[in-house]
Amino acid sequence: MFDPESLKKLAIEIVKKSIEAVFPDRAVKETLPKLNLDRVILVAVGKAAWRMAKAAYEVLGKKIRKGVVVTKYGHSEGPIDDFEIYEAGHPVPDENTIKTTRRVLELVDQLNENDTVLFLLSGGGSSLFELPLEGVSLEEIQKLTSALLKSGASIEEINTVRKHLSQVKGGRFAERVFPAKVVALVLSDVLGDRLDVIASGPAWPDSSTSEDALKVLEKYGIETSESVKRAILQETPKHLSNVEIHLIGNVQKVCDEAKSLAKEKGFNAEIITTSLDCEAREAGRFIASIMKEVKFKDRPLKKPAALIFGGETVVHVKGNGIGGRNQELALSAAIALEGIEGVILCSAGTDGTDGPTDAAGGIVDGSTAKTLKAMGEDPYQYLKNNDSYNALKKSGALLITGPTGTNVNDLIIGLIV
């Protein structure tokens, strides 16, 4: 029988080891030898860019003529021989984003039909790789991105707008590289692995239209300038002939690993979904309800059980607190699980960061909400104010891993004994 502390340690162990299964260096090293590449320009963009680039360098060495890496602040792990390594803003682009994107375009503008760009792409690329269309300022992009992120819009909707305001998104980067070829290795952080949505699809034909982008802005009541509206009307490319793409990792892989690890530990384990994409607090309440069903009725699984969920929820920010979707999901579940023994829920961003915080997510049990109440705090008020970070910090329920170097959505595990 597990005591609360050992159950907590086990949940964290399963989460961490599952994430290791989608470490980008492993996937890159497995894929590159099959591609017969020589004398390439390497461009790596995203939260996993550094590790992907390092692995590519270890495989290809001097076959890489030039390498440029663009990743999130704090995600570079040091120099790579003869590579230029930059860090930039996420989830909102900043001045460094613009500078580094210009640098990448300088490189590819010199290429001809005999050249190849090895494009290593991972989640976060929408913010880290950006150059607005003429007439649109960085400030306008920042304001619009922030509004979309707070609106509750899905990642597909957000990226539909982003693609229509960018010189590199929605297939425009591959269009700019032409007549050179793009060989892309993609680590997916998008449910369904849609290549036109991952990092806003810089090297894939865009299936969305200008009309779609305008409808998203209208749906969420987001005001924009006339210059932004004019820019959106410039349609993205719908056909590209110079692109070869390889998908090397996704949320299905991390969930499969979690299931396998839980079974090894003696749990009845099942993946409930890899497409969780509702409001974070609703997801927390829903997952808690299934955990209670297992706890008290032994269905849909008998105890000891491990319920595994993959996906990416959204948070419609109405309060002025701090947190992220995984922390909000965990806090919501903690409220629903209050007082129940032998249950634990761990919700984590596979990149090790959740919202604008230092936490990867939260790990809660039946005592989390009780701990807050014993301090004279109301957990529901924290949830209402979108202040999950401070609630979980006070109750000792934050999950802090540091940047993992990968990014394939979120992993949620519920253990019931």
From Swiss-Prot:
Phenotypic consequence of R325 to A/K: Significant decrease of the kinase activity with a 17-fold decrease of catalytic efficiency
Reactions mediated catalytically: (R)-glycerate + ATP = (2R)-2-phosphoglycerate + ADP + H(+)
UniProt xrefs under InterPro entries: GK-like_C_sf, GK_N_sf, MOFRL, MOFRL_assoc_dom, MOFRL_protein
Keyword Cell division recorded: no
Effect of K47R: Significant decrease of the kinase activity with a 180-fold decrease of catalytic efficiency
Endoplasmic reticulum listed as a keyword: no
Source organism superkingdom: Bacteria
GO cellular component, one term: cytoplasm
Cofactor(s) demanded: Mg(2+)
Pfam families hit by this protein: DUF4147, MOFRL
Keywords: ATP-binding, Kinase, Nucleotide-binding, Transferase
PANTHER family in the record: GLYCERATE KINASE
Subunit composition and interactions: Homodimer.
The protein's name in its UniProt record: D-glycerate 2-kinase
Source organism (scientific name): Thermotoga maritima (strain ATCC 43589 / DSM 3109 / JCM 10099 / NBRC 100826 / MSB8)
